[in-house]
Amino acid sequence: MDVRLRRALLLAASLALLLTLLFAVPAAAQQEPKISQARATEIAKLDPKAVAATEQHPNLTPSASRNSSTGLWEVGFFTGDNEVVQVVVDPNTGKVVESWTGYQVAWRMARGYPGAFGRMINAPYIWLPLCAIFVLGLLDWRRPFRLAHLDLLVVVAGFGLSQYFFNRGNIGVSVPLAYPPLLYLAARALWLGFRRRGGIGLRPSLPITVLAVATVLLVGGRIALNVADSNVIDVGYSGVIGADRIADQKPIYGNFPDDDQSGDTYGPAAYYAYVPFEQAFPWSGTWDDLPAAHAASIFFDLATIAGLFLLGRRLRRGRRGTELGILLAFAWAACPYTAFALESNTNDALVSLTLVVALLCLTSPISRGIAL
């Protein structure tokens, strides 16, 4: 690695460190409602979806409670333990803000709430530039009509179309739209893996120094965004709970709290991976900011990036290996969907890290045994 590249990386690392000093602004305190619980229930009964459900299930039982985060009245209509309809009422105006039926009652993530996954990463002024950096950074301007460039577009545009409808709560459209890009990428991976002749791979037109600096800045930005404005979905929450159970020598399965009853669906390895982070940032017992989940996701992400860099150096010797490692690290750091997983604080990068470690260990029998 030459002197210019080292200086550029040092400057980029300094800028990235400044970005990580961002912090989140605390939410405002919840005010007393002007609309009473009984009044909110009566308003909810007049909602068209509640009326239609009552016609089908005459014995529906309403139950109202305030959401601790938003302060809104959530009026559920139950038949037994099954919530058929949920109507959300503004506690100050009495206006019906939302009403849900079907799977969108139980699964809030399917409602299309802004930022439900990753919060600010979904903002167009962040998401679109990140997509542009990913595509333009890996583009070979000298040969624009390569199939590899179509791969890049499928990642950002193919999945992006599905995500557009998902973010708006239109799951019936979003899910079918996810299949074409998945099938395309699966077919491409099989073709690349089984063809006899090796390809030339991606040959970005940008200098490797630019990609190296961009990688460091992107990593710093991803971490800063995670610290400042990211949320922990049920996946990360489950990991922290499982780690807490293991550390306390309690059963994992069938022993999860009411707000994450189905969180014990993973294998024990997923929970063990969270143990060091839960010990460093002990679980409070509630679904709060969960710093252990943030720390785990950041570690999985950074370890994957480092592993990809080492993998590039393993695949090729000398300077070419370093350049390939930087290219692989840049591709991960610039990909909007790896950032999407990080800002949702999932365990997705743990799977990627496992695959990268497996590839690194393939050339050594001892390493393969340790990895297993």
Give residue spans per PLM region.
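Short, aromatic-rich amphipathic segments at membrane interfaces
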Residues: 91-124
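Boundary at the C-terminal end of the N-terminal hydrophobic targeting segment
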Residues: 27-29
